[in-house]
Design a protein with these regions (language model features):
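Conserved hydrophobic/aromatic beta-strand scaffold that supports enzyme active sites
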Residues: 52, 60-62, 82, 105-107, ...
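Alpha-helical bundle regulatory/interaction domains
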Residues: 2-39, 43, 91-235
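Glycine- and acidic-residue-biased ligand/ion/polar-headgroup-sensing regions
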Residues: 56-58, 65-95, 131
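Conserved short histidine dyad/triad with adjacent acidic residue
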Residues: 11-16, 41-54, 58-75
Length: 235
């Protein structure tokens, strides 16, 4: 296990090689606060491997689970999580279960999830983002306030190339080379977050997708505006 050990910046990255779920949770609490403290302990030993990072307003991860893990979900300030499974199954318990598996991606609103299970040697790439970050970015891109909550399509076919860009950014962020970039740039965590937000808004279907794809309004040349004003004044 290693963490980002830079002394000049807040630590936000965990690298684990088959750390026990208890040890992973303890390290998480030390680095990010007691978000998951008080959760029931696993009934059987579970090992967690991979990389987990959390920066203001979101997280990214590439994790694998050796053993089945069922855990409750804490209140995560209206975060939306996106899962790209590569092995096993992940089961989110809401009013009904939603199951992610290789080829099937999920977008889940964590506030509506009661518990989540990682089953059958589950592994995935994933990220979580606060809804407010999506709303802020959409307002900037569309040039107007966002009046409705952004809602993402809950289940997608990962066979579509559109989703590979998101996964590639997560893979880059959880790769060994990225740690060098983190240590060399204090702005990198924020830039990474911007890349993830933009790639999700661009690729994962949501209720503002159509608005984003509309061509931006163009300013007509002055002579065109004058002609239009004349026509309006002299019908």
């Amino acid at each position: 296990m290693t963490v980002d050990t830079s002394t000049s910046r807040k630590q936000f990255l965990i690298r684990s090689e088959n750390m026990s779920a208890d040890d992973f949770g303890e390290l998480y609490t030390r680095m990010f606060g007691n978000l998951y403290s008080g959760m029931p302990r696993p009934e059987r030993p579970v090992a967690i491997g991979g990389v987990y990072g959390r920066h203001e307003g979101g997280s990214f991860r590439r994790l694998s689970f050796r053993g089945d893990l069922l855990t409750e979900m804490p209140d995560l300030d209206d975060e939306i999580t996106f899962i790209f499974p590569s092995a096993g199954r992940v089961v989110f318990n809401q009013s009904s279960d939603r199951v992610g598996m290789p080829g099937v991606g999920l977008a889940m609103e964590k506030a509506q999830v009661r518990s989540v299970g990682f089953i059958d040697g589950h592994a995935h790439h994933g990220l979580s983002v606060r809804r407010a970050l999506f709303a802020r970015r959409l307002a900037m891109l569309l040039g107007r306030p966002i009046t409705h909550k952004v809602r993402f399509q809950p289940r997608v076919d990962l066979g579509s190339e559109a989703f590979q860009g998101i996964k590639a950014i997560v893979a880059m962020a959880t790769g060994n080379e990225f740690e060098m970039l983190i240590r060399s740039s204090a702005l990198m965590p924020e830039r990474l977050q911007e890349m993830l937000v933009d790639s999700v808004l661009d690729s994962w279907p949501h209720n503002y997708s159509e608005a984003l794809r509309r061509p931006a309004p163009q300013i007509a040349p002055r002579h065109v505006r004058l002609a239009m004003e004349y026509i309006q004044q002299h019908p």
